[in-house]
């Protein structure tokens, strides 16, 4: 029965069902998720830290690769630039 259904479709359908169930519970006045302000602040701090680490690491790595001749292609480019007197 489910052989022809994409895994992504199944995941999206399950998430939709959870979201709809949560909305029904909210409309009935039932708290589906008990979350306090401290939990939200902790989550925010964790996400901020993770984002800054990923951002700093990726931009640093990209800048380092971009500005240095460390790959095989980069080394060939450096040789060509030196040969044409275009290297600083």
From Swiss-Prot:
Q: Is Isomerase among this UniProt entry's keywords?
A: no
Cell compartments where the protein resides: Host membrane
Q: Is Membrane among this UniProt entry's keywords?
A: yes
Q: List residues traversing the bilayer.
A: 15-35, 45-65
Q: What Pfam families does the database record attribute to this sequence? A: Holin_SPP1
Membrane topology of the entry: Multi-pass membrane protein
Which keywords does this Swiss-Prot/TrEMBL entry list?
Host membrane, Membrane, Transmembrane, Transmembrane helix
Q: What are the GO cellular component annotations?
A: host cell membrane; membrane
Family as reported in the entry's similarity comment: Belongs to the SPP1 holin family.
Free-text function comment from the UniProt entry: May be involved in the secretion of the autolysin blyA.
- The molecule here is called Protein bhlB
């Amino acid at each position: 029965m489910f052989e022809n259904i994409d895994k992504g479709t199944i995941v999206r359908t399950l998430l939709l069902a959870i979201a709809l169930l949560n909305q029904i519970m909210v409309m009935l006045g039932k708290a589906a998720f008990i979350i306090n302000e401290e939990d939200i602040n902790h989550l925010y701090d964790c996400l901020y830290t993770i984002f800054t680490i990923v951002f700093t690491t990726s931009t640093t790595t990209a800048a380092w690769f971009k500005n240095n001749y460390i790959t095989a292609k980069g080394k060939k480019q450096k040789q060509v630039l030196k040969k044409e007197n275009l290297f600083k």
